[in-house]
Regions:
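Glycine-centered structural positions embedded in regular secondary structure
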Residues: 21, 138, 173, 187-192
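Short acidic, gly/pro-rich beta-turn/loop elements at beta-sheet edges
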Residues: 131, 149, 174-176, 184-186
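Short, well-ordered beta-strand elements
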Residues: 163-166, 170-180
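Short, gly/Ser/Thr-rich active-site loops of penicillin-recognizing serine hydrolases
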Residues: 144-146, 181-196
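Short, surface-exposed loop or secondary-structure junction motifs
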Residues: 1-158
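Short active-site-adjacent structural elements
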Residues: 160-161, 184
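Short, glycine-/Ser/Thr-/acidic-enriched flexible segments
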Residues: 157-158, 179-181
């Protein structure tokens, strides 16, 4: 007999981040679109944004990485390539600062999402806050008394760390890319306070 886990909480009452859910979302995108997640990203995000230095890494396309960078642990040991590196949806997009800024500008210009979709992405979908933060659709949400809502996301995997922080009220963006996984994450509000 199948074991059915107990429900952790009712829908729309809490948020618990799960990389596995993003992997599931990538599979849903493939099933609905009829193309691979890699091709979907290329056609619907990278090409419209002219992101020429971005690619979704899979185990089958190591040669497509443009100017590949090695990731390191906190003691400067090179991270090894493991089988989970080919999982998609929760990680695996290789990009650079210029392409990240093109992606950001496309969000401001409406190239990727309609205004109503952006509102949903940047809207709190429950009352739960963790360390003063909430979660929208694919964006964590921090708050600043002067600059307002701060949509952002962090990422890390096997020696790499990323910060993508938006300040829509000022049309400002912070992108931090690192190839060493060392030390604590930056506080998003501290990063935002570096901006004028």
């Amino acid at each position: 007999a199948a074991i059915v886990p107990q429900v952790a909480y009712s829908p729309n009452t809490h948020h618990y981040y799960s990389n596995t859910n993003y992997m599931l979302l990538a599979q849903i995108i493939e099933n609905v679109s009829g193309v691979t997640y890699k091709d979907y990203l290329q056609t619907n995000i990278f090409d419209p944004c002219e992101m020429t230095n971005s690619v979704l890494y899979t185990r089958d396309n190591k040669d497509e990485l443009i100017n590949p960078v090695k990731g390191y642990t906190g003691n400067y040991t090179e991270c090894i390539d493991i089988y989970l590196n080919g999982a998609v949806g929760d990680k695996g997009i290789y990009s650079d600062i210029n392409d990240m800024l093109k992606f950001d500008q496309a969000l401001y210009d409406g190239k990727l999402l309609s205004d109503s979709s952006l509102i949903l992405a940047f809207k709190e979908h429950n009352d739960q806050k963790n360390n003063g933060q909430n979660y929208g659709y694919g964006f964590r949400l921090a708050y600043d008394e002067v600059k307002g809502k701060i949509p952002f996301h962090t990422g890390w995997w096997k020696g790499f760390r990323t910060y993508f922080v938006r300040v829509p009220s000022k049309q400002q963006t912070i992108v931090v890319l690192s190839n060493i996984k060392r030390g604590p994450f930056f506080n998003v509000n501290d990063l935002v306070n570096l901006l004028p």
